[in-house]
């Protein structure tokens, strides 16, 4: 087994047994909204599982809760449960969007970069809900993030993760949705440079969404590709 939190394999069965936890979790701190425009989110004082079953083929909802709920203290926590060949697709049209072929690149280019824009690299992250999982390979996690930016501005973000798990409790595939406008505004306001500066050494072509010019295949430039 790859995860210390797995309890055991059922003998003679392909099901995975995860540590039993109550069907509700009551230790969540109330969310304190920093939004100028919204009242405090209608966030429950305790987390209720749609399916509290822990005798599961894949991962149970209580196990998913324990795995993802620590992201506020450790941004890397999510990727501790990533398969080495995990593929991540960040949906939308913004600097984080794209298809990542390994978890390390996805983490550095998104969560790590975003975390560096937040004061003291601290963020309050909570789960709104968990759907699916258990005997289904796919699960959906709804997150709410709350922090203060390096410039002292209140910051909020809601994110949706759609995850495919294997029978060892590792994530094999992720599609995630974020607020593109919030991401772009946060990077623009809090990064000293926006993807590049005169201190960056460029060794790869970065032509933008339009791709390389047609002349690239007719000159020595084409031989370098």
UniProtKB/Swiss-Prot annotation:
It comes from the Eukaryota. GO terms for molecular function: isomerase activity. It catalyses: 2 [4-(deca-1,8-diyl)-2,5-dioxo-2,5-dihydro-3-furanyl]acetate + H(+) = 2-[(1R,8S,14R,15R)-11-hydroxy-14,15-bis[(6E)-oct-6-en-1-yl]-3,5,9-trioxo-4,10-dioxatetracyclo[9.4.0.0(2,6).0(8,12)]pentadeca-2(6),12-dien-8-yl]acetate + CO2. Pathway: Secondary metabolite biosynthesis. Glycans are attached at residues 146, 195, 217. Residues 1-19 form the signal peptide. The keyword ATP-binding does not apply. It is an enzyme of class 5 (isomerase). Belongs to the dimerizing cyclase tstC family. Dimerizing cyclase; part of the gene cluster that mediates the biosynthesis of the antihypercholesterolemic agents phomoidrides which are dimeric anhydrides. Within the pathway, tstC produces the bicyclo[4.3.1]deca-1,6-diene core of phomoidrides via the dimerization of the monomeric anhydrides leading to prephomoidride. The pathway begins with the highly reducing polyketide synthase tstA that catalyzes the formation of a C12-fatty acyl-ACP, starting from one acetate and 5 malonate units. The hydrolase tstM is involved in the release of the C12-fatty acyl chain from phiA. This is Dimerizing cyclase tstC. It comes from Talaromyces stipitatus (strain ATCC 10500 / CBS 375.48 / QM 6759 / NRRL 1006) (Penicillium stipitatum).
């Amino acid at each position: 087994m790859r995860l210390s939190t797995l309890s055991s394999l059922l003998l003679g069965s392909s099901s995975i047994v995860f540590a039993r936890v109550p069907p509700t979790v009551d230790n969540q701190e109330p969310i304190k909204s920093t939004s100028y425009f919204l009242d405090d989110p209608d966030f429950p004082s305790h987390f209720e599982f749609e399916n509290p079953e822990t005798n599961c083929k894949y991962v149970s909802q209580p196990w998913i809760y324990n795995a993802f709920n620590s992201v506020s203290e450790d941004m890397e926590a999510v990727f501790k449960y990533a398969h080495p060949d995990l593929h991540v697709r960040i949906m939308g049209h913004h600097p984080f969007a794209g298809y990542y072929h390994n978890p390390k690149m996805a983490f550095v280019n998104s969560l790590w970069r975003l975390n560096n824009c937040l004061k003291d690299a601290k963020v309050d992250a909570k789960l709104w809900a968990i759907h699916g999982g258990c005997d289904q390979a796919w699960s959906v996690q709804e997150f709410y993030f709350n922090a203060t930016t390096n410039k002292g501005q209140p910051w909020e973000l809601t994110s949706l993760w759609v995850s495919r798990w294997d029978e060892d409790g590792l994530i094999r595939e992720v599609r995630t949705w974020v607020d593109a406008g919030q991401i772009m505004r946060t990077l623009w306001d809090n990064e000293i440079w926006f993807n590049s500066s005169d201190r960056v050494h460029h060794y790869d072509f970065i032509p933008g969404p339009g791709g390389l010019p047609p002349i690239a295949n007719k000159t020595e430039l084409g031989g370098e590709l």
